[in-house]
Amino acid sequence: MRRALVVAPLLSCVLLAAGAPAVPLDAARAYTPLGVRIEATEYRGRKALRVVEPAVGQGGGIALAHGITFASGTIEADLAGAPAPGAAEGARGFIGIAFRVQADPQRYECFYLRPTNGRTDDQLRRNHATQYISEPEFPWQRLRKEQPGVYESYVDLEPGVWTHIRIVVDGTRARLYVHDAPQPVLIVNDLKLGDTQGGIALWIGQGTEAYFSSLKITPK
């Protein structure tokens, strides 16, 4: 039986299965912050988890969800990202979800968005609105240099606006869906960590102020 694990960043962690109870969790205790600071708040009418760097420009990081091991299946999230006050000119509001996070939490797969690229007049930047990376061996710089355009794509985005994303992972393949679209905006057929498993984390890049209002995981 497929079971959906819903991690509501503020208040609860709920395993959705026949008769399964809700397990209340405090937001700060539901995640381990690694290179980020997290706090419960309200944003644009929703209870949310705010994720920022301890100091703007330090390089981003992750908030690792407790008690989750994920191999294949579906990950859904509602998120909103924008450049943080005082961020450098190159900040794009980088925000996403890391998956298959390894015991060394610097090793993971990730899909993320660049919200300020979504409606810019620069077509090349628009083409870079979404991104796949596999840290630490395959950051965006290496992927763009070695295979330009393969691990990035366009999608309409607005900074600071709630955006629904869905990541479907199957073995060494993954698909990113945005705005409940029936077709993926980015397809990866060669996940760099291979067919493995690991944790799930909220992800932000350098100079980002991020908000997450839900996280739902459905194992395959």
Give each language-model segment a name.
Residues M1-A4:
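Positively charged n-region of N-terminal signal peptides that target proteins for export
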Residues V7-L15:
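Bacterial N-terminal signal peptides
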Residues G19-K220:
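Extracellular glycan-recognition regions
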